[in-house]
Amino acid sequence: MLRKMGKKKVIIVSTVGLIYDGITSVILSYLQAMNLSKMDIYVVSTIKCEQSIKKSIQDLGCHIIELPSRKTETLKYAVQLTKFIRLQKIDVIHAHGNSATLTVEMLAGLLGGCKKRIAHSHNTQCEQVRADKMLRPLFYRLYTDAFACGKAAGEW
């Protein structure tokens, strides 16, 4: 159950970094359209972060959380994400990606005590085909809600 008093705490993750791409555009569009007054929004910066995007997110009143590279320091990234979720008592994790490697964020959410874990698919293919196939059965069990940018992305 989400917190009744105070602001809801939401962490948003782009698995490809905060760069000029479709995922970041969707995240920014959502943040710009939402009433953020009843939420504390944390946006994870990993892999790469364009400074102008970081500034846009901060100008909306959101917090940027710097974490190790998801690509090169995956375990360290996952541990720090889990700790942050637990310490901040995050209500919702909304992770954007292209494959079942979103398992990393969904597992961090579960282990961190986050009740609402949203996996958001942005594509119908991925670069990590082997990891995707291996992680997919676990992935299906970890998220509580799933979004997609289109019908094909949702079916994939």
For each feature predicted by the language model, list its residue ranges:
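Membrane-interface segments of envelope glycosyltransferases acting on lipid-linked substrates or membrane lipids
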Residues: M1-W156
